[in-house]
Structures are given as C-alpha cells and as structure tokens.
Amino acid sequence: MDEDSSMVADNDQDREFQSLDGGQSPSPMERETPQQMNDQSPPPEGGSVPTPPPSDPNPATSQQQAAAVVGQEQQPALVVGPRCAPTYSVVDAMMDKKEDGPGPRCGHTLTAVPAVGDEGTPGYIGPRLVLFGGATALEGNSGGTGTPTSAGSAGIRLAGATADVHCYDVLSNKWTRLTPFGEPPTPRAAHVATAVGTMVVIQGGIGPAGLSAEDLHVLDLTQQRPRWHRVVVQGPGPGPRYGHVMALVGQRYLMAIGGNDGKRPLADVWALDTAAKPYEWRKLEPEGEGPPPCMYATASARSDGLLLLCGGRDANSVPLASAYGLAKHRDGRWEWAIAPGVSPSSRYQHAAVFVNARLHVSGGALGGGRMVEDSSSVAVLDTAAGVWCDTKSVVTSPRTGRYSADAAGGDASVELTRRCRHAAAAVGDLIFIYGGLRGGVLLDDLLVAEDLAAAETTYAASHAAAAAATNSPPGRLPGRYGFSDERNRELSESAADGAVVLGSPVAPPVNGDMHTDISPENALLPGTRRTNKGVEYLVEASAAEAEAISATLAAAKARQVNGEVELPDRDCGAEATPSGKPTFSLIKPDSMGSMSVTPAGIRLHHRAVVVAAETGGALGGMVRQLSIDQFENEGRRVSYGTPESATAARKLLDRQMSINSVPKKVIAHLLKPRGWKPPVRRQFFLDCNEIADLCDSAERIFASEPTVLQLKAPIKIFGDLHGQFGDLMRLFDEYGSPSTAGDISYIDYLFLGDYVDRGQHSLETISLLLALKVEYQHNVHLIRGNHEAADINALFGFRIECIERMGERDGIWVWHRINRLFNWLPLAASIEKKIICMHGGIGRSINHVEQIENIQRPITMEAGSIVLMDLLWSDPTENDSVEGLRPNARGPGLVTFGPDRVMEFCNNNDLQLIVRAHECVMDGFERFAQGHLITLFSATNYCGTANNAGAILVLGRDLVVVPKLIHPLPPALSSPETSPERHIEDTWMQELNANRPATPTRGRPQNSNDRGGSLAWM
C-alpha cells in the first residue's frame, strides 16, 4: 500500500510509525507526514526554495571550488577566542548523466571515505563522499521537488525508500552512481552508516516492509569496483531500530546508541569490537549520567576516541539541547560525561560531524512544524575550549529568537542550512551537507563550509572556555573537557611502591603554543591545514623515508609469504587480505585482564631537569627542576602523514645541527662540551684511513656483543641525535660527559640509534660515539636505528655529507665502510631485566625478547625480517585510547601498536618499561600505555622546523627515571654571510622569546592527547 491511513497529524507528537510506536502489532509502513515525522509546515509562499548564489561551473576549478566558495565570506581576521560556526554555500557539482546525482531525498546517510593508494600512482582513488539510501518522494508529490498537493497530507513515501549508492569525488567535484557487486541492503531510510577505513558500514533503518533487519552490511570501496558484504555477527545485538546513531570510536569500536525499536525510544549502548573475531555485539552499561531514551540524535567520534552524542528527541517528543561525551577508560570501563557549554538550541533530525576538535552541527527540527533557524541553524561545539558557538558568537545562553513555521526571507546563508533529515560528512577541513527536508520540499543541494579554525585552538579559546564554564552546574566538566581519573592521582601520590609514576604536563610550552594537538589520524585526506611549513616539511620527509624503505618491506613480506618468516596470529591493521576484505588486528579488551604488570621497581621521577635556552643574559645557563606534570607538549608528537607529492628527501641543513666521529684523537678533537664550535671549513679532520681504523676497532667490539645488550643501572639514555652534534655537546655540558673528568666512572651511556642523517655533522656524531665505544667499551653502548641503513642514509644527508666533506672518492668509500659497521650494531638493550630499550617498537610481530635475540648479525635491512622492520620502524598509536594495530602514516606496510600491545609485551617478558626513540616529541620525552612506554628524542628543533625540546633519561641505582631537557637555542645574531654555519631559510618556525613565559602552576588541565595516567576526554 502507498499510505498508512492511521498516521494523522497529532499536535506535536511524532507517531511516524504509529503501529510501531504505539505498541500495536507491526505492519509495513509506507510514509511519514511532515507534521509528525518532520514537524514541517507549508513551504514558503509559492512553494519555492530560495535559490543559492551560483557557483563557478568551470571544471578546472573543481578541486578548489568547495574551499573557495566559502572563502568569500570568511576573510582571515584576528581571532580572539573560538571561531564562530562557518557559513555554508552551494557546490555546483558535475555529473555525466542525471541519474548519477542523488536527486532530492531525506533520511539518507553521507559518509566520508579516505583516499586509496598514493596520489600519482596507478589505482589511486581520491577521497569520496558515499551517499546511501533515504526517501526520494513525498505523498502527493512523487517528484519531491515541487509544492505538495496538500501541506497537511504531504508525507514521506517509504515506498520510495532506496538502496542506491552515489559517490561524490571531492577532487573532481563529480557525482557518480555506483553499482556494487554483491547483495545490497534492502531499501531504507533513517538508518546509520559509518566508515571503517575504506569501508562503509550500514545498519538498521526502516523501509517499505517496516523495520530493517539488524544485519551489518559493508560496502568495500578499496577496489575500483565496490562490493557489498554482509558481516556475520554472533549472539544478540541491538535488534531492528531506526532513528539511532552509530560511530566508530577509537578506530576500533562500532557503537550503536538509542533510536526507536518500533515501540519506544531507547537509551541502550551497544559496542562491536572490530578487532575481535568472531564479531559480536556487547551491551554496555556505561557509568556516569548519560542521555535519556531518545531518537534522531547525532553521534560523531573524535580522532582520539571520544564519542559525542548531541540533541535528539526524548520519549515525550521534546527536542533536546544536551550533549554527552562517551569514552573508554584504560581499564575497560565506559563512562558518560555531560559536555560543558550552552547549546544555542534544542534540535533533532539534524546532522553533526567532527573536524578535529570542533563538532559542527547543522539544521534540525523543533517540533510543531518549526525548525532551527537564525544564527543557531549552524552551531559548533569546540571541545578544546568547552564552548558552543553559533554563526555570530560564543553562546552563553540559549537563543530565544523566532522559530517561525518555515518563514521565508532573512539571511540567505541561514536559509540554506534551515533543514532537517539531511546528512553531513567532513573531508579534511571541509564540511559537506546533502539534501534533507524543508517545508514539505525534498532538497537536492550539496553545501560546503570550511572550518578555518581546524588547526586553531588558541590560548584565548582556553580562557574563553574557563570564563564560560565558571558557573557550570554539578556533573559538568568545567573549562576545557577533562575527565580526571582519580585512581591515577592516587597512584601518583603513592609512588613508594615503585610503580611507574605518571604525571600531567603543565610547563611552559615550547614556542608559547598552548593548543592541544588533536589532529585526526587520517592525514591522507586533503584540506588538512598545518600551522607552519616546518611541520609540512617533516611530514614530507617522513613519507620519503617510508618510500625509501618500501622495497625492503616488500622483500620482507615476500619472505614471510614464502615461509621464511613466521608471524604470530596478527595482521597489519586494515591491510587487505588475499580475499580482498580488510581485517583488523586489535586485541580483545578482555585480554587486558591477563596483562597486568607488577608495578614494582621502576618509577618515573616526579621532577625533570630543564636548562634555559638562552645563551646569555640573566637566564643564561639557568637550570630548573620542573614537575613532570608541567610539560604541556609531552603529548605532541610531530605528526606524520602522506603529502600529495612525497619525493626523495634532500639533505636538510641547519646551522644548529651536528654529529660525531676515532679513539683518543677523536675524543681530544671533538669532546668539547662547552667549547665546541662548528668548523669554519667543512673539510673533515679525519682521512679515510683513520676512519677505517676506527670502524675496525669498533666493529670488533660490536661483533663480540649480543644482539640484546644486558646492562645495569645507573645509566643515561639518549634518543635520536640525527647529526645534531651541537645538541649532543649541550647535553654533555649540562648533564655530564663521558670522560674521566666527567661521570663515566660511575654511570653508563646508552644511545638508541639514528646517529646520522638530517643534520650537518653526522660525521662528527658517529665518529665521537665510535671513539667513546672503543675507549669505554663497557660503559658506552650503541644500538641501531632505522637510519643506520645504507638505503636510508643514502637519501637523507649522510652520503651527501661524506662526499661534501671528504671528496667524492674518499667520501663514498667512508660512507660504505660506516654502513658495513652499522650492520653489526646491537638491536636492543635490557636494563636490570626490567626495562627494554629499542629504536622503534614492537610492531605487529614482536611478542618476546627472544625474537630479537635470535636475529643474527651482521644484517642488512634488505635481508631482514618483519621483526627487524617492526623493531626499527614501528610507532605507538596516537594515544592510549587507540589500541591494537593500525596502519602507520609513515608509509604502506608499516604499523603502529596500541597500549594493549605494550602491556601484553611487558607481561610476556616480565618487564616494566619500554624506552624507545624514533619519533620527534615536543618535550623530548612522552609517556604512553599508562607510562609503560616512553618515547625519547634528544635532538632539538628537529630538521630546523619542529622547535621541539631534546631530552635524555637518567636511570639511577634506585631505578627512578629522571627526564633531563634542553630547549632549542635562539637563532644566532651573526648574519648568514658571516656565520660559519649559514642561515637556512625557514629554519625556525618562529624565534623563541628572549624571556620565556612564566611556568604555569601545578594542576592545570591536561591536554587531550595526554599519555599520562588520567583520562583526558576533550
């Protein structure tokens, strides 16, 4: 049948499926009335929809059109506090034929899918928006675009619900209708969809036959020709429902919440762990105050694992204005928290999507034929600042403007977003909206807005947040979102048991940068803005490194396939299996229960030692001890991504960067912690014969050592140096040097690799370290990094430096000789059998230390296994909320590993701490996995652009770990022409202030990427 005659207007009650909501026996439903389902009243006079300004149809500008169309009204301006909600404009998208476009519809979904492959390579597919399902017709108006025959009887025809798929290519600005292989889902509307990698997961909804089954349908878009799959899920699940929400949390958990099961609105929470097979739904009972039973809300997940549920309509058909955050504790508990800030309006049947830390909310209905309009039709919840903004200002009280029944006129930009039952998705900094319903008229327009604040979370925003939340009611989180885990605070206060003590960063941030790094993981998407060229250069350089190692990785994988390498039962994140279906490699959450690590012995000292960066003046050489909780930037790793054009990296020059080089002569010439100056002449002071002698002596020592060194405390641990010999000398000067006049007689030295490349003085660095190894072979220890490989350091500066400073013939010979020595370097070090030190990480393949011990040396990267690749190349995931294995943004085939892998490894090997290097971190050190892993980086201002601090770890006999830091030096006052080390353009992101800002007080909120002991949600 075409209509459900039982559905009649009933004041403000939405009985869209009366036989379902009313508890009567279900029967097929085929339409909804706008008064009931959509709460719409008649369209504007004449039945027309305001015509948006035309866009440039020129295909040549299609890639920039979406950003340009919003840029006209959003000129750069001085921002004091959070930016207001952006303005939307119409995109004039192209299509080859009419049916390629989705046409008018509502109740559909729009899902952003990241790019596949590398741009410029065969098979590359750019970022896309995938539109599925929805209702395409209204009762009394089959076309859905004109004036209905009667405003009161115009309803949504569920007989017109579809299961078609349309794809919008963001780069080409073009719609295409897809015809995937496989069995599609049944036609439906009011369903949910979310992306899992390059797959779109569909669930629930309602169609011509009533409620859709609870099956999970997956549209795999990895290949050129998409394919539908049905996911087999065991046990009971959410059951059939519509008007619910679903999101992927922490890149792992599919969360389904609320909706209507045909009888009543719901408030239940279901989770499906995509890493655990067989798949099964688990009903959660989160702690804290959660949302009431409701439907037509929105849910969007932030990249760090926070799910935000916003708005909706409760069991009494009352629209909601509240927002709730849901996050997972490290012990497996889930908890709700009410989001701070004042929402500008209640709403339901709206759309919401995160762009970094900002939740963009658009449109929505209020009931009684009213829709959200005026400046509140578009709103932003800035989760970094803890405030709501509409298109005009920060919201301090609910808006009380008019909510007329579809009144025409007014601001055209506001009119564009005055709609409900539409869908939204984000690609980079761009927010797209498609379709929906306004005044009984189905819409078919594609809107776009640019979030100019995507990379901004300013100091002023933090102050605005604090001011806005001064009078927050009980149960709300004041100021910035932050959920403090009291158990970890107690742990910090009871450190006498010897546990690893974790603190929260609070110290003067480098560069005065107060913003929380909440960049999304999927850096592959275009439009992601970075605040400086330096970070872009580091991203490009890291991608080039991955490109350089790709052949080696492919060879290692080939050996694995041929049976030469046996891997444990794990896979590589979302890599494709032979069947073409992406798999997941995260560990079951209940396995964490068996991963307990006895917190005895090792602990992180509650204070770190910091040296002022100034070389003179009142602060010159001043040493301070700061609380370990005072490092604002500890959670900020220099992000990696895949830039649009990653080419072979060139040598980076920085007049601050240096490195070392044979025994007593080398030590006498180079070990000058306070007096070393970069040589005026670049000619290296050793000849190739002397370097050969040094390498021969050191190589004999390395060959006699085990692959995993067995060391004792006390010991100093150094991270990446990358040819920055000046930083090595500064660390020796401030915290003791390896000489008889220094502290070598009572403390050992351990270096974690990456001695060469990037900096100007790789020869000095490696020469001095080798000389120290020969002179103090039982006290100075070196292990291998990923740059101690010929195929890498041929591209990133070391080979060029050898030729430049020793001539082509001798330079190439020396480069080959030192790389042969690198093949003998040990690969890890165990300290007191409680700490394991390595360069990269444990990746996907390393479960036991014995796997590392069994690697035979000498070994080249080309001949190495996946174990060697993981050991030298893998990284931790973005933060503690991202568990299991994920693809590594450094490049294809490389992985990141989550805190569950760290805990499992420590438990398997009776270890308490992993110390690794490999990644630039802003404070020189960074904690992960509740403090069971520390990333260490000793070179400051990495690549001349990162402006990061450098650090070492000092482990005492009492097994207390003390971080000791140095900050980047300010640029030299001498001119580039007269300076021995020529000034290079864009060396610094910005100059450091002559006087650093005052140290913030203890106890300030942690940033959202905290790797310490508390759970910072927002």
Swiss-Prot record:
Gene Ontology annotations of biological process type: brassinosteroid mediated signaling pathway
EC annotation from Swiss-Prot or TrEMBL: 3.1.3.16
Stretches for region Disordered: 1-75, 569-590, 994-1018
Domain of life: Eukaryota
The Kelch repeat ranges on this chain: 149-195, 253-301, 306-356, 362-409, 430-479
Extent of Polar residues compositional bias: 994-1011
Tissue specificity remark: Expressed throughout the plant, with a higher level in younger parts.
Keyword field: Cell membrane, Cytoplasm, Hydrolase, Kelch repeat, Manganese, Membrane, Metal-binding, Nucleus, Phosphoprotein, Protein phosphatase, Repeat
Active site annotation, chain numbering: H787 (proton donor)
UniProt: Mn(2+) 1 binding residues: D720, H722, D754
SUPFAM superfamilies: Kelch motif (SSF117281), Metallo-dependent phosphatases (SSF56300)
Biased segments, Pro residues type: 41-57
GO terms, molecular function: metal ion binding; protein serine/threonine phosphatase activity
Top EC class, one word: hydrolase
SUBUNIT field: Interacts with BSK8.
Name of the featured protein: Serine/threonine-protein phosphatase BSL2
Organism (species): Arabidopsis thaliana
Taxon lineage: Eukaryota, Viridiplantae, Streptophyta, Embryophyta, Tracheophyta
